[in-house]
């Protein structure tokens, strides 16, 4: 547990340029506070002290606005940036050095027992407001765009965007436009553009037909 805590702190230092010192990180980063309290609650959970574990996780939720079930399994170097509104379910599994932004939900899609939450590989990034729902895997080095809704497996080294999410980048090769936390494709705007293109094509076809009709009338009048 101590090794994981040290790695969590180092991950904040490495990923956040605003982090200036270890003391500042320990005192002011609510995402780190939630992760540290999760580490403690998870230890109690593994000892089958479930009530104590859940009480600690609830205290963490009240303090930080981040809810991590103590039954979740999270690797080292986990960083929750900004943090508020993050929800991580009981059977979630998260690999090493993953990054999660505010408002993310790693949730289930049903009430059944057993595995019902996602598994994230190593070095996965999940953007702000994204929802990953179901017992499937998001592969190593994958990126989930802000506000995406992921309902099926994302292969390693891929980028997913949209509602429902689709792959836009695979193994370093662009499938569609690239994205980051700010510049991501807008599914509504893309659909609107597609409709405008179709309308423009129809207008051109109508114009050609009108010209042809005028020509036929002129020829018929001779």
Where are the predicted features?
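Terminal amphipathic alpha-helical/low-complexity segments used for targeting or macromolecular assembly
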Residues: 1-60, 175-222
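Solvent-exposed, flexible loop/coil residues
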Residues: 30-31, 36-39, 72, 78, ...
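Structural signal for interior beta-strand "rungs" in well-ordered beta-sheet cores
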Residues: 61-168
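A structural signal for small-residue-enriched, beta-sheet-centric alpha/beta enzyme cores
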Residues: 166, 170-178
């Amino acid at each position: 547990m101590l090794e994981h805590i040290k790695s969590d702190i180092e991950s904040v230092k490495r990923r956040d340029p605003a982090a200036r010192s270890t003391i500042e990180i320990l005192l002011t980063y609510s995402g780190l506070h939630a992760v540290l309290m999760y580490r403690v609650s998870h230890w109690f959970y593994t000892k089958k002290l479930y009530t104590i574990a859940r009480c600690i996780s609830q205290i963490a939720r009240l303090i930080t606005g981040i809810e991590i079930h103590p039954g979740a399994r999270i690797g080292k170097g986990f960083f929750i940036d900004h943090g508020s509104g993050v929800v991580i379910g009981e059977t979630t599994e998260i690999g090493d050095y993953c990054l999660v932004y505010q408002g993310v939900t790693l949730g289930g899609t049903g009430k059944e027992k057993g595995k019902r939450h996602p598994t994230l590989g190593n070095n996965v990034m999940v953007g702000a407001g994204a929802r990953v729902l179901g017992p499937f895997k998001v592969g190593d080095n994958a990126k989930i765009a802000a506000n995406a809704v992921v309902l099926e497996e994302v292969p390693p080294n891929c980028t997913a965007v949209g509602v429902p999410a689709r792959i836009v980048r695979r193994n370093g090769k662009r499938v569609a436009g690239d994205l980051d936390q700010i510049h991501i494709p807008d599914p509504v705007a893309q659909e609107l553009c597609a409709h405008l293109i179709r309308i423009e094509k129809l207008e051109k076809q109508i114009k050609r037909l009108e010209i042809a009709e005028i020509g036929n009338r002129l020829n018929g009048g001779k």
